[in-house]
């Protein structure tokens, strides 16, 4: 029969193991839910790999929108320094057009083309997603008003 002290020690050890496993599973779930934002220049400097789900923001390059062999829409996102090829098989937003700011979310295929699952276009002529504006500012091509991007002057658009 196990003495009282040994039984308490076994209970504490089992509780610690359960806690470590729970924290580990929680961190794994959180990591799979996180989507990092990149500019085309950041991707050129440090490619995130083909397994990573990412967001890329920038401007749709003029005269880059076309149809891929698969029937998907193919276009290029630029920050005026580097470019990222994108393919998207869904319906594009009504405000999607060349020269317009976009944020796409997806994964890179083995051929280096970003396979987008979602495409978000800016919703009016004054809004620029803060991540996109910051990436353009860092690339030295920000053409917006003032030092900080705003969501159409409404303070916080969330």
Curated annotation (Swiss-Prot):
Tell me the GO molecular function terms. heme binding; metal ion binding
Look up keyword Ribosomal protein and say if it applies.
no
- UniProt topological domain (Periplasmic) ranges: 30-158
Q: Which chain regions cross the lipid bilayer?
A: 9-29
Grouped into one coarse class, the protein's main location is membrane
Q: Which Pfam families match?
A: CcmE
Keyword list (alphabetical) reads: Cell inner membrane, Cell membrane, Cytochrome c-type biogenesis, Heme, Iron, Membrane, Metal-binding, Signal-anchor, Transmembrane, Transmembrane helix
Gene Ontology CC, one term: plasma membrane
Residue ranges, Cytoplasmic side: 1-8
User: Which subcellular locations apply to this protein?
Assistant: Cell inner membrane
Membrane topology of the entry: Single-pass type II membrane protein
Query: What positions does the entry give for heme binding?
Result: 123, 127
GO terms, biological process: cytochrome complex assembly
The annotated region (Disordered) lies at 139-158
Q: What does this protein do?
A: Heme chaperone required for the biogenesis of c-type cytochromes. Transiently binds heme delivered by CcmC and transfers the heme to apo-cytochromes in a process facilitated by CcmF and CcmH.
What the entry lists under PANTHER family is as follows:
CYTOCHROME C-TYPE BIOGENESIS PROTEIN CCME HOMOLOG, MITOCHONDRIAL
Q: What does the sequence similarity comment in the record state about its family?
A: Belongs to the CcmE/CycJ family.
List the protein's name. Answer: Cytochrome c-type biogenesis protein CcmE
């Amino acid at each position: 029969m196990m003495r009282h002290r040994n039984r308490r020690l076994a209970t504490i050890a089992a509780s610690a193991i359960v806690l470590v496993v729970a924290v580990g599973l929680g961190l794994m779930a959180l990591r799979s839910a996180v989507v990092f934002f990149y500019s085309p220049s950041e991707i050129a400097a440090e490619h995130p790999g083909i397994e990573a789900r990412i967001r890329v923001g920038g401007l749709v390059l003029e005269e880059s929108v076309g149809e891929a062999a698969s029937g998907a829409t193919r276009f290029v996102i630029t920050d005026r320094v580097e470019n990222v090829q994108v393919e998207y098989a869904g319906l594009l937003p009504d405000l999607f057009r060349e020269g317009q700011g976009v944020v796409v979310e997806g994964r890179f295929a083995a051929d280096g083309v970003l396979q987008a699952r979602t495409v978000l276009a800016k919703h009016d002529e004054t809004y620029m997603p803060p991540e996109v504006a910051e990436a353009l500012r860092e690339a030295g091509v920000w053409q917006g008003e003032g030092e900080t991007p705003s969501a159409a002057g409404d303070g916080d658009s969330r």
